[in-house]
Amino acid sequence: FIIYSSLKSYIDLFIYKKSDIVEQFGKLDLINMAFQNCYLNSKKTESYFLNLINDPQSDYSRYTFFYLSNEVSNNDLATVDNFADTIDPLRSSLLISQVKKWIDEKKYTKLTQHFSCQNENDILAEFFFLISNFYSSQSRFDYSNIYLNISNYLNPKFYFNLSLIAENYQSNNNYDLAKKTFEKFDDKDEIFFWYKTKTIARIIACLLYTADAADEHFG
């Protein structure tokens, strides 16, 4: 019901060009309203994103990417620079650490190459990622991967989300698929490339340990 209601609100948004969310799903409503206002280029967009990012009870720092991407689209680079100065890369997710590096290097267009609030597929892709992430947090990795594949199909530009499907594979001890997924990151996105290199090394170590244990058992 939650997925259906949210998708219906997006379909209505795309058809009628107005947001008409009935608040009943807590923070999910706030997330949806942030993206829907962003799609409409509403002046409320900033406040919705900042309310999420600054939530004291939960970590919604992921939405920093979309907030700053929208500010770049609106050519408000001063706001982007000032916000980036507050980001601690050592305490941030891979995505937000990568965002800070781009901004510090004045590569602002990186934030708009991968996502646009005016692209309906991009917005729906983020919604499906949200559902995927929820299932992953419940250790329901098969469901998570289904929604993540839908998300990736809708917006293949946002390949950073592949890190979640790789982590799902690892959690299921499917190291070969995890390794193949991580291989899709290259050195043009330095933070993700570093994470890929570190994680693949750990995966190889696990595979070698498993092989040695099998040899010892059957040898």
Report residues per predicted region.
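Single conserved hydrophobic/aromatic residue that forms the stacking wall/gate
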Residues: 209-219
